Design a protein with these regions (language model features):
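Substrate-recognition "cap/lid" segment bordering the active-site pocket of phosphatases
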Residues: 99-142, 148-152
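Short amphipathic alpha-helix with an adjacent loop that forms part of the alpha/beta core around
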Residues: 134-138, 173-179
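Acidic, Mg2+-coordinating phosphoryl-transfer loop and its flanking beta/alpha structural elements
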Residues: 142-176
Length: 179
């Protein structure tokens, strides 16, 4: 005898999703890498720069440290986020594409590409500024990202946005979608 649940499962068509996943703050721990070099979290560093040199200098000095003084090795050496490998292992069977925001210097594109080569070789990566990620949104297209504004923009283009808070929460939301 077949259960009603079994019949219901068989009647539901399988939805083919396209998964896009952010890197920094989802898979790769940007903050830990920054703190390794600066001795302060990014927020603490920005506050210190603002106090010493004024708020107009914050972004220039922040990105100068990362892209000019450290360069490619900053990006290539970023450690996995806690739970990042677990999340990657969960989404990998669905052939995700990384959708990552680069800094304005080419060192981030080069370093992030090397990070992918070192940790998850063969994975496609697309570089887009956060505000332009929604160009890839649409029905059945999922974005996992840690920026609320990026997720809201994605959803406004009929995409499925999952705001990353932690690995378990993301996996739970993916399971709710049948993944």
């Amino acid at each position: 005898m077949i259960s009603i649940n079994k019949l219901f499962e068989e009647e539901q068509p399988k939805i083919n999703y396209t998964i896009y996943c952010d890197m920094d703050g989802v898979l790769a721990d940007f903050e830990a890498r920054f703190e390794h070099f600066a001795g302060l979290s990014p927020d603490e560093y920005r506050k210190e720069i603002a106090q010493k040199y004024g708020s107009k200098q914050v972004d220039n000095m922040f990105w100068d440290l990362i892209d000019k003084q450290i360069g490619v090795r900053f990006w290539r050496g970023i450690p996995w986020m806690p739970g990042g490998r677990q999340l990657w292992d969960y989404i990998k069977p669905y052939n995700p594409t990384l959708l990552s925001s680069p800094s304005f210097d080419n060192s981030s594109r080069m370093g992030k590409s090397l990070w992918v080569k070192d940790h998850i070789p063969g994975t496609p990566i697309i570089f887009r500024q956060a505000k332009k990620k929604s160009e890839f949104a649409g029905p059945n297209k999922i974005l996992i990202d840690d920026r609320e504004d990026t997720i809201m923009s994605w959803k406004s283009k009929n995409g499925i946005g999952i705001l990353y808070k932690n690995t378990d929460q993301v996996i739970s939301e993916l399971k709710q979608l049948g993944l």
